[in-house]
Amino acid sequence: MTPIEWLDDLGVLTERTIVGHGIFLDDHPWTHWHSPGADLRRLAEHGATVAHCPTVFARRGIALHHFGRYVQAGINMGIGTDVYPHNMLDEMRLVSYLARVVAENPRDTRATDVFHAATVGGARALGRTDIGRLEPGCKADFVLVDCAHPAMRPCRDPVQSLIYSAGDRAVRQVFVGGREIVRDGRALTIDYASAAAALEEAQGRALAQIRQLDWAGRGPDAIAPPTFPGL
């Protein structure tokens, strides 16, 4: 019995279910289940959502098999970050690139599908009709992008230019619920200097405790070797 089959058997696989990652289904090349393809059908039939967070697994050499196939199966897809740096536009780009590599088809995953997953797909997963889109009665959550930014040029298709080229470099303003929280690329709701100092302090405390907490008593350089040892 696969994990998805088990959820179905328990009766908890519904349109309110959000499956984190959803990578190792019964037809993933790394698994050897008895009924390949049944998991995709179950997810689609029950209206469940897969929260696709590519970076955290790609760092380990693991990829969804694959985004375009899930979309074509009728599964609602959402996109998340799950690991630092939390950059939604970078995640969207990686979703597309990994899907095309795994599918061995550059046309398998469209920017339209990626943008949909990052907006409307996520809203649907949360059962929200007031977010994920710009319509009367919806929350005023939106970004303003500088289409004159060099990384956006030529701007024949601004969505593709934003996802595949510019990323957050071209983002000028961000509004959440109608409130401006980013202006000229800088967050207005955080004290960067204080946050950076607190982060450095926390890292120092963590590094000092690593040998005591690690099962083998290893130091930080043994667990996460520096790029250039000795520097």
Where would I find each of the regions flagged by the language model?
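Generic structural signal for well-ordered, non-membrane alpha-helical segments
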Residues: 36, 81, 85, 111, ...
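Flexible loop residues that form catalytic
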Residues: 22-23, 100, 148, 179
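His/Asp/Glu-enriched, well-ordered alpha-helical/loop segment
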Residues: 9-16, 49, 65-152, 163-167
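Short acidic/glycine-rich loop or secondary-structure boundary segments that cap or lie
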Residues: 27-29, 59-61, 86-89, 152-154
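Active-site beta-loop-alpha junctions enriched in small/polar residues
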Residues: 22-25, 55-57, 82-84
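Active-site microenvironment of metallo-dependent hydrolases
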Residues: 119-231
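Histidine/acidic residue-rich metal-binding segments in metalloenzymes
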Residues: 1-49, 60-77
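Conserved strand-to-helix beginnings and helix N-cap segments that scaffold or border functional pockets
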Residues: 33, 61-64, 89, 156, ...
